[in-house]
UniProtKB/Swiss-Prot annotation:
One GO MF term attached to the UniProt entry: aspartic-type endopeptidase activity
Keyword Cell inner membrane carried by entry: yes
Annotated Gene Ontology cellular component terms: plasma membrane
Main function: This protein specifically catalyzes the removal of signal peptides from prolipoproteins.
InterPro entries to which the protein is assigned, alphabetical: Peptidase_A8
Catalytic residues (positions): 120, 138
Single Gene Ontology BP annotation: proteolysis
EC numbers for this chain: 3.4.23.36
Pathway assigned in UniProt: Protein modification; lipoprotein biosynthesis (signal peptide cleavage)
Membrane topology summary: Multi-pass membrane protein
Name this protein carries in UniProt: Lipoprotein signal peptidase
Annotated organism of origin: Haemophilus influenzae (strain 86-028NP)
Organism classification: Bacteria, Pseudomonadati, Pseudomonadota, Gammaproteobacteria, Pasteurellales
Amino acid sequence: MSKKSGLSFLWLSAVAFVVDLLTKYIVVQKFDLYESVNVLPVFNLTYVRNYGAAFSFLADHSGWQQYFFILLALAISGMLVYFLAKNNAEQKIQNSAYALIIGGALANMVDRTYNGFVVDFFDFYWDIYHYPVFNIADIAICIGAGLLALDAFKSEKKKVQDKQVEKCGQK
């Protein structure tokens, strides 16, 4: 009997993908470009177009970056699907991380492929400082990265504990 692989976590990719594209669709349908609706004293919903990557990285270049980010999203997603296939389903944190990153990367890739830009709309600010505007896909990618860091920390802690137990057993 074979064990379930990490591919069973791809439902999480699908959720991140669909929720991201649905929220972007709603923003594009309901907002004019740069229109902003105040939600909280530190938070607006603001429709912006991002021609680069996170924090508008490479946004001011001649257009080659669009193809670069599409290829990068495909390559990373393919690599992470491979890792999911190799992982055991019991590796919940790592599998969840990979799945969230895949969903976010592919959602932004579809947006970039279809529109030539990524729709961003979460706008947090304090006084005159505005954090870069972002979307659900960005959140999924960041949570995935955070989970990978957490998993690495937990794995390292377990290695240290295993060594301590091993030393105690040798005495």
